[in-house]
Curated annotation (Swiss-Prot):
Keyword Glycoprotein appears in the UniProt entry: yes
PROSITE patterns (alphabetical): G_PROTEIN_RECEP_F2_1, G_PROTEIN_RECEP_F2_2, G_PROTEIN_RECEP_F2_3, G_PROTEIN_RECEP_F2_4
GO BP terms: adenylate cyclase-activating G protein-coupled receptor signaling pathway; cell surface receptor signaling pathway
Species per Swiss-Prot/TrEMBL record: Mus musculus
Protein family membership: Belongs to the G-protein coupled receptor 2 family.
Protein name: Vasoactive intestinal polypeptide receptor 2
GO cellular component, one term: plasma membrane
Amino acid sequence: MRASVVLTCYCWLLVRVSSIHPECRFHLEIQEEETKCAELLSSQTENQRACSGVWDNITCWRPADVGETVTVPCPKVFSNFYSRPGNISKNCTSDGWSETFPDFIDACGYNDPEDESKISFYILVKAIYTLGYSVSLMSLTTGSIIICLFRKLHCTRNYIHLNLFLSFMLRAISVLVKDSVLYSSSGLLRCHDQPASWVGCKLSLVFFQYCIMANFYWLLVEGLYLHTLLVAILPPSRCFLAYLLIGWGIPSVCIGAWTATRLSLEDTGCWDTNDHSIPWWVIRMPILISIVVNFALFISIVRILLQKLTSPDVGGNDQSQYKRLAKSTLLLIPLFGVHYMVFAAFPIGISSTYQILFELCVGSFQGLVVAVLYCFLNSEVQCELKRRWRGLCLTQAGSRDYRLHSWSMSRNGSESALQIHRGSRTQSFLQSETSVI
């Protein structure tokens, strides 16, 4: 019963990224802790103590003398399910180790009534972000097709939008594929075969991390493009290659460095744990830099727009242009920058519940917001769609009129031919009657 509760909780733990079955990962972590315990006990000299060091399948106990009480924290492998910090103990007696006390479930808080609500919360969050990524993927795909179909929409601005769309689509696909593998219940578990599939598991995680980082950097490219457009340092079209290098190149370099540090420093499991700080910061620092730079660009863009909109030198046409620019972009940059900045600057003081809601629920609908702002509400896109719709309507109307005209001409021709035929028969009859007379 105790193991089933823990495994159920583990299956719905959403903050981890994995590509193997959760139960297999659970057993793997138990094996890793057992190996560490064996190494620790082998390095210690027992000095003929009454109670030798032992691994009791969940916790490592050091050697002790009779009458000594050994106290250890709750097992590390269950740390994701602690409702409160706790300790468990054992006494060393003349007959050996005593039973663990206090009760394992009571000491570590696994029977906390909040556990059921937490599991329900994780299930709800998973359902919400699955819906969000699915809707975002469909809307982004539709928006990309629209931009690609109309040649008048082919420009540097929309090329950048397409790359941003692609980064969001890849992010959604990587999350949905990861979840389909992680929460798949088809087939029998063969955990002893899982280590042979670590390569595919690690590759899936590398792809996932790359999509996340590329998405952040294409949001940064959008901010850079808008800032360049406002300050007019260089023509935006001349910077497109640099934008490509920033959006796809920098994440490639960073993920390559992260892979190298993982292989050399923490090549364990599916690379979804962060026990070593160096690989964690190798992948986290570039994302933090993009968030901070994008937030600084947002502040600068707001300042420039306010100056231009309040300037008396700005004419009516220019002012309306800046207003359109502000409507289509200023709603986007705060949405992608401000809440990320909050969690980047204050990661400790904010509840993990709110962070999960923002990162998973709100973040999953970002692709939908991007598609709406940069495609469906874009005046150029709407004009092209209306023009194409009018063209289709006119084509159908013309085809219908042509069919009606052809049918009318055919009918008139048939009636004329019938009248001529009748007249010729009458004339022939009269001629025959006359000849008889």
